[in-house]
């Protein structure tokens, strides 16, 4: 038996110390900030509370075989969830969620964050030792600075991005090995893992490595001499390594690309400059970061930054290397300043929030430059004593205090205003409400939605977490055509990638199978459900008109494009195409303007008898997503309307036997000094007699499935004639369908937000199963690449052994 030598034990102890120190510092931050589990300030902040916590709950259900990894009906109208998995959840750390109860997932997030920080410290310390041969104390100090740089601390709210910081040092050392030793395998494997864990940060990392490898090549060529043959050889090896990494990860990368490439809203490129000179300078200073979307997170420890700068004036370093270092530094700083560069780094898309997403690259490059500078300083006799404990320990203590102070200032801005107790209470109440509905309903298909969320108006993924089918969705990985359809029908702002069910819309709810609503106010057309909920915020209402998953429809709906004047006319057009004749569910109400000023506009509206009155605000083209108004309907006030999450059809009044008079006004929203002057409210009435007649007609030809679960629909449908069956399932190429054992094609409907299939007169046995597009092809590519790499390695070893 081989016993570990002292060097091995020393290394293990060193990396254990790195891990433990980072975890301890992280825990100390939580204690100082009274952050859960050491206080009531929840660790859930920003997108952690809006998105991730529900995604983790869903992933936990997937791992426990309670949900399907490939497809879910719990977001929008349904979606391919491979993009959701690969973008948000592919980190191996997330497998630990099964070890935590459903009501302790905040603790799971906190625990995995601590583990990731410890691993970043280990990875970056390993890189410094391997690349520059730094002694342990110096490697410990610099890697600690990288681990707790401003970018990391501010982006713990985006767990999917953090794994990249573990792999980036390994990728960088792979570049060094490739240039110096012509070895590719480390870079190949690290690139593959990077893509597997999060393709988004992998793209950013690969783009950076294309620049970083040039610096390593310049440094190597400065020592060994330049030749075009050498450059071509290394360029081909680098390109080959990246390509092989992508091929190895094709099992997840290919289906991800297919899932995420369906289009969707694209933000316009903003102003050329993303920040001001003052904010840019603040970004380099400790304790000066401001959570205002304009302060870049460049700070990464004063000692490390000074060492990095010293490399530029160190004459022991080749002038070519120093120039290359300066050029890359300028590019990385400019990437957080200039919109076009940010656009390139973020996948040729304008990022929505979380400014300076690439600042971690500058922090890593500072780590590399500081390590290089220390390597050169170590060669000077005068600096050899600097690595002694008497000198390095005070520097380490000062660095730790400085990093802690900076992180504490940032946490005081990020981890406030949301109580973990309030979060736990809401989840428990919501779970009880949904369970009560599910226990009393035997139907295989129905949808549920609610107008209140866990926090603010953006926690819209509760269906995924609790296992029910909802319309609301807030995710960068969804079915964009379904979201676009929902928003255009009046559920949210047109052009947004999210949908919020802010208020029931009877006619669309019925068509899409929303049988239960949990609203703040009693919705017109609904009846109180028998769920015995005493809490008014959890009162459940039942939609007696809700249709099943499929209905007979005319051929007009196939490959149809709906009119887009406003949501009411769009609904009229949708129902007309379904029925094959012109119908007017909604009629326009003429409103009389009673006041029109820059700060207040008011109308008097008369709702006809036997009709539900609604309004919708067509937004001013200049209003964008973040310029709301205050909407008042009689005595009811909605503080923020016509903005990102609240641009919805709103109920004016329930139906009555006689016409009713109402006052509607829009004014300046709280926190704003003015309002968009060209916001245009439109007023319509839903004719209940026409609506009920249409519902009776559609209910006579419903397809009621016997099996309805994520990724699978089965059932018998009896058609009166050969015709078309409309499904409230978004069109997706991944559906495989048989009717009476014969394969049939799904056809797009309603701007691809719905789908349809042809059926024959009489009995139709329908079976729909979902297979992730690209999954089998990607797996085949990954397996073939793995076999080829193993064969190449075995051949190389065999060839070497014969020499």
Each language-model region and where it sits:
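Start-transfer (signal-anchor) and selected internal transmembrane alpha helices
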Residues: 1-35, 233-237, 395, 787-803
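Active-site-proximal, structured, solvent-exposed surfaces of multi-pass membrane proteins
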Residues: 2-8, 55, 582-803
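Membrane-embedded helix bundles of polyisoprenyl
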Residues: 22, 113-131, 136-220, 234-257, ...
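Membrane-interface coil-to-helix junctions
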Residues: 25-121, 144-166, 204, 260-265, ...
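Membrane-interface helix-loop junctions at the exits of transmembrane helices
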Residues: 27-36, 62-66, 96-103, 137-158, ...
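Membrane-helix boundary/interfacial segments in multi-pass membrane proteins
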Residues: 42-45, 152-162, 271-296, 330-384, ...
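Signature aromatic-anchored transmembrane alpha helix within multi-pass, membrane-resident enzymes
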Residues: 243, 377-406
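Extracytoplasmic/lumenal acceptor-recognition loop(s) of multi-pass membrane glycoenzymes
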Residues: 401-421, 438-509, 547, 552-578, ...
């Amino acid at each position: 038996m081989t016993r570990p030598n002292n060097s091995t034990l020393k290394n293990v102890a060193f990396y254990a110390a790195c891990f433990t120190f980072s975890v301890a510092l992280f825990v100390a931050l939580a204690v100082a900030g009274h952050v859960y589990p050491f206080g009531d300030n929840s660790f859930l902040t920003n997108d952690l509370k809006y998105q991730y916590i529900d995604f983790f709950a869903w992933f936990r259900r997937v791992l426990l075989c309670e949900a399907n990894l490939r497809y879910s009906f719990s977001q929008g109208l349904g979606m391919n969830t491979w993009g959701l998995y690969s973008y948000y959840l592919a980190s191996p750390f997330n497998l630990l969620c099964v070890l935590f109860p459903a009501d302790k997932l905040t603790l799971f997030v906190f625990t995995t964050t601590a583990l990731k920080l410890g691993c970043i410290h280990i990875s970056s310390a390993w890189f410094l030792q391997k690349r520059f041969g730094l002694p342990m104390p110096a490697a410990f100090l610099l890697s600690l600075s990288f681990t707790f740089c401003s970018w990391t601390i501010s982006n713990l709210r985006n767990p999917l991005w953090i794994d990249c910081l573990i792999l980036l040092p390994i990728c960088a050392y792979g570049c060094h090995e490739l240039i110096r030793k012509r070895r590719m395998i480390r870079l190949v494997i690290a690139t593959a893992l990077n893509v597997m864990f999060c393709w988004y940060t992998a793209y950013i990392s690969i783009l950076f490595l294309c620049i970083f490898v040039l610096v390593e090549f310049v440094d190597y060529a400065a020592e060994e001499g330049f030749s075009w043959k050498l450059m071509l050889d290394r360029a081909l090896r680098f390109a080959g390594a990246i390509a092989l990494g992508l091929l190895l990860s094709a099992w997840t990368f290919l289906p991800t690309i297919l899932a995420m490439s369906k289009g969707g809203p694209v933000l316009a490129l903003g102003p050329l400059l993303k920040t001001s000179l003052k904010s840019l300078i603040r970004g380099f200073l400790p304790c000066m970061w401001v959570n205002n979307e304009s302060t870049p997170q460049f700070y990464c420890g004063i000692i490390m930054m000074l060492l990095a700068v010293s490399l530029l004036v160190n004459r022991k370093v080749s002038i070519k290397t120093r120039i290359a270092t300066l050029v890359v530094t300028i590019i990385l700083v400019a990437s957080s300043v200039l919109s076009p560069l940010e656009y390139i780094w973020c996948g040729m898309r304008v990022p929505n929030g979380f400014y300076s997403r690439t600042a971690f690259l500058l922090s890593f490059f500072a780590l590399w430059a500081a390590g290089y500078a220390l390597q050169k300083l170590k060669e000077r006799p005068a600096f050899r004593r600097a690595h002694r404990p008497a000198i390095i320990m005070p520097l380490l203590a000062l660095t730790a205090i400085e990093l802690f102070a900076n992180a504490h200032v940032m946490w005081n801005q990020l981890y406030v205003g949301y109580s973990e107790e309030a979060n736990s209470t809401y989840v428990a109440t919501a779970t009880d409400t949904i369970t009560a509905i599910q226990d009393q309903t035997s139907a295989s298909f129905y949808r549920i939605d609610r107008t209140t969320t866990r926090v603010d108006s953006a926690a819209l993924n509760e269906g995924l977490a609790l296992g029910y089918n909802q319309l609301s969705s807030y995710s960068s990985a969804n079915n964009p055509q379904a979201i676009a359809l929902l928003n255009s029908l009046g559920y949210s702002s047109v052009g947004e990638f999210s949908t919020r069910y802010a208020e029931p819309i009877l006619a669309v709810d019925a068509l899409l199978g929303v049988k239960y609503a949990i609203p703040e106010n009693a919705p017109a057309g609904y009846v109180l459900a028998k769920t015995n909920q005493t809490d008014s915020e959890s009162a459940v209402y039942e939609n007696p008109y809700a249709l099943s998953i499929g209905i007979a429809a005319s051929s007009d709906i196939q490959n149809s494009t709906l009119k887009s004047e406003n949501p009411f006319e769009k609904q009229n057009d949708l129902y007309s195409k379904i029925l094959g004749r012109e119908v007017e569910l909604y009629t326009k109400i003429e409103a009389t303007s009673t006041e029109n000023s820059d700060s207040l506009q008011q109308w008097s509206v008369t709702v006809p008898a036997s009709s539900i009155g609604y309004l919708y605000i067509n937004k001013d083209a200049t209003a964008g997503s973040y310029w709301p108004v205050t909407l008042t309907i009689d005595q009811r006030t909605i503080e923020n309307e016509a903005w990102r999450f609240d641009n919805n059809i709103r109920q004016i009044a329930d139906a009555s036997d006689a016409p009713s008079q109402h006052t509607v006004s829009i004014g300046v929203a709280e926190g704003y000094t003015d309002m968009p002057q060209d916001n245009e409210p439109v007023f319509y009435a839903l004719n209940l007699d026409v609506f009920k007649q249409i519902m009776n007609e559609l209910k006579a030809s419903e397809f009621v499935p016997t099996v309805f679960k994520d990724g699978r629909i089965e059932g018998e449908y009896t058609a009166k004639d050969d015709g078309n069956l409309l499904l409230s399932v978004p069109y997706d190429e991944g559906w495989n369908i048989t009717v009476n054992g014969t394969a049939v094609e799904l056809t797009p409907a309603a701007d691809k937000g719905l789908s349809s299939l042809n059926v024959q007169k009489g009995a139709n046995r329908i079976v729909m199963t979902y297979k992730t597009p690209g999954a089998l092809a990607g797996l085949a590519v990954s397996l073939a690449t793995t076999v080829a790499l193993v064969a190449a390695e075995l051949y190389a070893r065999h060839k070497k052994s014969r020499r």
